[in-house]
Amino acid sequence: MKFGNFLLTYQPPQFSQTEVMKRLVKLGRISEECGFDTVWLLEHHFTEFGLLGNPYVAAAYLLGATKKLNVGTAAIVLPTAHPVRQLEDVNLLDQMSKGRFRFGICRGLYNKDFRVFGTDMNNSRALTECWYGLIKNGMTEGYMEADNEHIKFHKVKVNPTAYSKGGAPVYVVAESASTTEWAAQFGLPMILSWIINTNEKKAQLELYNEVAQEYGHDIHNIDHCLSYITSVNYDSNKAQEICRDFLGHWYDSYVNATTIFDDSDKTRGYDFNKGQWRDFVLKGHRDTNRRIDYSYEINPVGTPQECIDIIQKDIDATGISNICCGFEANGTVDEIIASMKLFQSDVMPFLKEKQRSLL
């Protein structure tokens, strides 16, 4: 069993940006003390939904501030920056941390990112696949060159080279069937969404495994991650109530940060996300409180035993044993840390014990 901690860097209305950055640093350091293997950093621009425009820089700080903790991105918006510059950053972090950096990628969901950084969002999938291919070759060969419809440049040496054999581990934030199939072709581990239920997670893994096996990958040796919003309290009602205000603002900020969910938006390649949003609306989840209530049904928010039951159900359905939680909805920094420590003492050991008994 492995455990990760998502650091969202969302700015609630009552907090300044300086307070959010202090929270990021403190929670990163505390994560190592609380037995988490990895912290994950999210890339966002131009929105309070996330203040971290450059996760590479934040990762460098946290890697330097810790001794054993892995630090990953969940995820870098791959098509909005030049692939050579990105590999230089990834290799540098891989070298300086002696292999503790994790390179999580996605193709992006937010229109402003693409407009400001000069990338056509309609091509996000093709660019992501192209950029990944260039970066992966650069990780193993030490050189990069390109001559295709998306990008052209002469062969260059990438410095520094990777520290880890084959390069820093790559993860993919995957929600749609097409992204799942693409990740499976390369045997890349997925970070599964916290907004889908157990049956949906199981179906996604079944699709992945079918494709991965066709491409010759050992599906029993792929480090997928289950992601969750998490709040642990001996009083289940308190666990839910402490998160409600944060999640309400956070959900609304997410919807407002992109026009993808607007029926008038014609951006190509996001049919899955638009369809998922329509399903939310039909279920009444456009109402923020109803979305929060549904989130509580499928995420570990409650007593330690309730959290164990929810996570173990997903572990048993998917076989995934890398559990990644986000605790920032728990209020103040002290309240967040208290929930993390209770998760460490009253949830982690029992998930490990049950997992061992299943082997």
From Swiss-Prot:
It comes from the Bacteria. The keyword Flavoprotein applies. GO terms for molecular function: alkanal monooxygenase (FMN-linked) activity. GO terms for cellular component: cytosol. InterPro entries: Alkanal_monooxygenase (IPR033924), Bact_Lucif_Oxidored (IPR050766), Bacterial_luciferase_CS (IPR018235), Luciferase-like_dom (IPR011251), Luciferase-like_sf (IPR036661), Luciferase_bac/NFP (IPR002103). It is an enzyme of class 1 (oxidoreductase). Pfam families: Bac_luciferase (PF00296). Belongs to the bacterial luciferase oxidoreductase family. This is Alkanal monooxygenase alpha chain. It comes from Photorhabdus laumondii subsp. laumondii (strain DSM 15139 / CIP 105565 / TT01). The gene is luxA.
